Amino acid sequence: MIKRVHLGQGRADEILDLPNLIEIQLNSYEKFLQLDKLKNKKPLLNEGLESVFRNIFPIKSGNGDVALEYERYYIENDALNFTEKECKRKGQSYEAVLKVRLNLQFLTTGEIRQKDVYMGTIPLMTERGTFIINGAERVVVSQIHRSPGVVFYKEKDLYSARIIPYRGSWLEFEIDSKKDYLYVKIDRKKRILITLFLRALGFDTREKIIETFYNIKKIKVEDSTKRDLPGQYLAKSINIRENMYYRAGDKITLQDVEDFLQNGVNEIELVDFDGYDAISGKCFVSSNVILNCLEKEDAFFALKDGSKELPKESVMLAVYGALFPGEPISIDNAENDLKTIFFSERRYDLGRVGRYKLSKKFGFDDLSTSVLTMYDIVNTISHLLRIYEGHDILDDIDHLGNRRVRSVGELLTNIYKGAMSRVEKIAKDRMSNKEVFNLKPQELISVKPIVSAVKEFFATSQLSQFMDQVNPLAELTHKRRLNALGPGGLSRDRAGFEVRDVHYTHYGRMCPIETPEGPNIGLIVSLATYSRVNDYGFLETPYRKVVNGEVTDELEYLSAIDEEKKCIAQANAAFNSNGKYLEDLVSVRISGDYTTTNPKNIDYMDVSPRQLISVSSALIPFLEHNDANRALMGSNMQRQAVPLLFPKPPIVGTGMESVVAKDSGVVVKAKRSGEVILATSSKIVVKPFESENAKDLDEYHIVKYERTNQDTCFNQSVLVKEGQKVESGEIIADGPATRYGELALGNNLLLGVIPWNGFNYEDAILISDRIVKEDLYTSIHIKEFSIEVRETKLGPEKVTGDIPNVSEKILNKLDENGIIRIGTYVKPGDILVGKVTPKSEGDITPEFRLLTSIFGEKAKDVKNNSLKVPHGTEGTVIDVQRITKEDVGNLSPGVEEILKVYVAKKRKLKEGDKMAGRHGNKGVVAKILPVEDMPYLADGTPLDICLNPLGVPSRMNIGQLMESQLGLAGKYLGESYNVPVFESATNEQIQEKLKKAGFNPTSKEILYDGYTGEPFENEVMVGVIYMLKLHHLVDDKMHARSTGPYSLVSQQPLGGKAQFGGQRLGEMEVWALEAYGAAHTLQELLTVKSDDMSGRVKIYENIVKGVPTNVSGIPESFNVLMQELRGLGLDLSIYDDNGNQVPLTEKEEELINKG
């Protein structure tokens, strides 16, 4: 390990170590599969896969005679067909068999038949948090989506409340503020008046509805109150006699008051619009929205005054008709259907999260019910009305209390739920069979729905992604990514600005910096460094507890809901050894407001300044001196850095480098403390101290030169020697882009910030030849080429070195089996695997039959279908894999064998390669200059790199200058530094180090021109900067073509490197050539070089023969136009100057010649 000097304003020690950075993946999958509990034979918790089986079983037959009951499941871990390494090599999936013990119970006879039923295979997660599917490593990205529960919001003039379940129908309430009516919508169907909906749910009288929402007051009816009563609403109906009935909810008139007095009504109950009851402490509704709805009912059903209540039939007809238009209605069925929509566990599930959110909102303690209750509906309506009246506030839908994370375990649980419901349906159908008593448990279960659902999820789901494996940081970030897209999430086109924006609840939970730059900005984000996901799926971040103004070492994880209204101090707030704050006023934040307060008011304190950003951003030194846009680019570009042959860790680091290397899974860590007894390039053996058994050894296999998903090189190198003692958890072998157990994505270069003859104009980069000669930025890239050997209708294809019409020179590189030899250097067009396919014989002529009879089988025709090296690729063959049916057991239908050839290429730094620093300072290498021509320092040291000073001011990424200054001091003092983010070294500290190293405190030095030896006019800033080579290499982008494939209809060359296409000559290029008057060049470009088919052939003949040429035919695009016009019914013919018809096609030519 490298000894680093802590240089910054904060404390070197942290109160809380960083968690395992991929625990979000590992913990979620362990919760789903509970492998540890299965191994140790412990009882399983009712979550993940276990909860799916418990919810589906028992499955009972229609008549209740037969029941299929679930006992337990187990994973056949010992019966794994292939190891992880073999799966990658053979293109297989790393998975285990899932078996479920089922009991088929015959309730009439009491007989029980038990069987362990095969339930398909289930992919297993590797220690690195990835899955291996069809030989490729994949990551299931966590999805951030809208949390189930209740949410209150406003759109235009509509105040709305929405109850979102985990599974089931959405229930929406909305108040039309213009008309003062409250409606309900189920699954966004036609809206229903709220009072009708309540009546359908059992609030069948006006009195019940009023007493549910309003406070009620009793008033004596006497002469003194006579004037106050008109205009008020009755809360209870009054029945004086048959023709004198006063309904609850009706407005009292003066005449009504007179009737009360005359008929001896002494006391009446009225609606009290004062929304607070002082005795019970309850809040009630204070607007007349519900009363308006009762009034609207009368108009809706055209009720005459004096009618007592709405008939139940009318209510059910109205509600059911809105929900299921056009369906026949029976009242009992309608009532049952309505109840099952919300109150049946099979149709509706709020989920643990939904129930938790509703309970938090309405102060309801029972967390056991997962269906909706009347209490929930009434509370939602009351709360919405109170918001409408201005007594409560709306919810913020972008608050992290309203968004939650679905990790891999939960996503898979949902997949299994859907598949098992189909299995249940099939089992019930099979149970209805008359022969049910002869059945066995396995005959009732159909595995197909499960197998296809799991396969589809891992292979095609938007959330199961091909792992970004360019370097260890890219891997780690991919596993910590949060995606708002995908099934049940947002879509790119409909996501607005608000949902993409940074929110104050993201602090310590989601990184405000790291996100893509394109259309996915803000929709794909990263977890913050200390963040974790709690049991409900909400993101939590740790804080230190502050008690009576004193900081304690007690830690507490808070979700965004818990953190609301809490007073939180920053991590760098100064306090003494007893935890007392040194300042009388401390900077704090309270729900997104930043202010200062007395230490006594503080509840919590941040654990670390890097708490709010992601791992990638925390690797950028002096981050706080950079503009946010450039920090975003810096975070993203570190993930694109290619692993180099000889990388070095940065002189100026942040302290995160070793953590990233350790948790990324690319390095080898010692499992137990012990002594190294064997260390070779491919294997390390450690004898543990704790074990007495001489055979109990820890073996570690070292990966050498393997291809990653992105064609970069995965290579591990041993760090220990035989006889060395190692501690548990110590890094004993480096991986790609790591050095001495630290992340090392690039190299430290001596920098001069100076323009040089225009070669670093517009972000271009000038590089010294020394960098290329010393292989500082040389990387290895490995490409895989594969070919299938198939069984065809005409016979099997053959892998052979006996290929027709191929020169001996090319065949010399193949071995006796027709496969390229390992170690051969191959170029475009070389054969990697010789393969011949039988040709169809067609109609054999007598002459050919004679030849066959003379020469035997040899004359039988075969087609050359060999695997060749594509254009633009060359390199050394490092491995050949042959995968047969015997190896794998299940190749695709018709495939006999698969051959894979791996070609490695060493790529040095070239002009056109993209390079970048860690601060978003990117550019393309414009010139590689000989060392002697580079500007040099007074002691003769030539610079490694020259960057343009104009790249700094407008980009506002000053961090690169500070890094360069400190890097310069570090290089000459032989020190490496830890400069944590938001606690960086000050200018004074940097200047002190520069002085100590013997440099000017400004780090400006006199530079000398390498051409003339003369000093430059002004002093130039010199430093040491950490630069990366990015995965945008000129070799992959450079492309040229002579002849190649043409489009079928237009006969013009295809476009793009992948299609081996040509360059497009557009109309603007035509104008340019017209302006020059280059008529012949233009004609050639538009005809023979494009789509003049006959002209192409003739000009090729002429070039081969060496004859001067001036061919011009008719371009195919003209023929296409002609055919289009003929399609419109216009018969067009073309004639030359002599009146002779010009043929456009071969057929026309024949017709003209005949005519």
Swiss-Prot record:
GO biological process annotation, one example: DNA-templated transcription
HAMAP family, per database record: RNApol_bact_RpoB (MF_01321)
Assembly behavior: The RNAP catalytic core consists of 2 alpha, 1 beta, 1 beta' and 1 omega subunit. When a sigma factor is associated with the core the holoenzyme is formed, which can initiate transcription.
Reaction(s) this enzyme catalyzes, per UniProt: RNA(n) + a ribonucleoside 5'-triphosphate = RNA(n+1) + diphosphate
Function, as annotated: DNA-dependent RNA polymerase catalyzes the transcription of DNA into RNA using the four ribonucleoside triphosphates as substrates.
GO CC annotation: DNA-directed RNA polymerase complex
Molecular function terms from GO: DNA binding; DNA-directed RNA polymerase activity; ribonucleoside binding
Domain of life: Bacteria
SUPFAM superfamilies in the cross-refs: beta and beta-prime subunits of DNA dependent RNA-polymerase (SSF64484)
Protein name: DNA-directed RNA polymerase subunit beta
Enzyme class: transferase
Pfam families assigned to the protein according to its UniProt record, in alphabetical order: RNA_pol_Rpb2_1 (PF04563), RNA_pol_Rpb2_2 (PF04561), RNA_pol_Rpb2_3 (PF04565), RNA_pol_Rpb2_45 (PF10385), RNA_pol_Rpb2_6 (PF00562), RNA_pol_Rpb2_7 (PF04560)
InterPro entries: DNA-dir_RNA_pol_bsu_ext_1_sf, DNA-dir_RNA_pol_bsu_external_1, DNA-dir_RNA_pol_su2, DNA-dir_RNAP_su2_dom, DNA-dir_RNAP_su2_hyb_sf, RNA_pol_bsu_bac, RNA_pol_bsu_CS, RNA_pol_bsu_protrusion
Enzyme Commission identifier(s): 2.7.7.6
Stated family: Belongs to the RNA polymerase beta chain family.
Keywords, in A-Z order: DNA-directed RNA polymerase, Nucleotidyltransferase, Transcription, Transferase
NCBIfam families for this protein: PRK00405.1 (NF001616), rpoB (TIGR02013)
